[in-house]
Amino acid sequence: MKNKIYNSQIVLTALLILFSVTACNNWLDVKPKTEEEAEELFSNMDGFKAALAGVYLGLSQPELYGREMSFGMVSVLGQEWGEGATLDNSYSAYSYFLNYNYEQSASKSLIDAVWNKMYESIANVNTLIQYSDLKKDVLGDYYGIVKGEALALRAYMHFDLLRLFAPYDFSDNAKVAIPYVLEPKPAIAPQLTPAKFIEFVLDDLNKALDLLKIDPIYLGSDVSGIDNGYLANRNFHMN
């Protein structure tokens, strides 16, 4: 992390997953490791649904919004936890974070876990975005909804990383901070200044807004009987 992480409170709107434990584990494993696996996964609509659900399930892991990015690390940094009974002092990273001490091994380990898991989730959503264009014919009428939601998720994840790992400096002389990753394959993405980084965030959000104009949540459509109700719970998604 940079010299200082600004106190902030993450507002987590709805990572609500309506699956059993067994189903969750299966969907969470939807991470194609080869091009052949990806081609098979995205050969039908069910594969896209599984991949999108897998992104949400990945975000619900303890390293991300299942703990650290909701009531764990970021809450400690925001001084929402106090000393004593309200803080599990056996978890030494939290006690260090209370004093903004990021140099201890426990602190670094937790910071690395958050960083790695978030970029892993970004890579997964980038694969989904890539195949939404390659398999547009498979998605049909769902293209705008699936790709739009994926773009919004990518912007959301990157913005949270910016808030934690970059300085608040939007001047022309700002130093480069963190990368905005657009490709699913492992590659070194260039570090960007905060101002340039925000341009990418806004670009993804604007594209998402345009694609999601057909989303039932905006249209107020009754979709309870369509596709076994898949579109019926859009209010629980990022958009």
Predicted region positions:
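Conserved, well-structured interaction surfaces
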Residues: 90-165, 187-196, 207-213
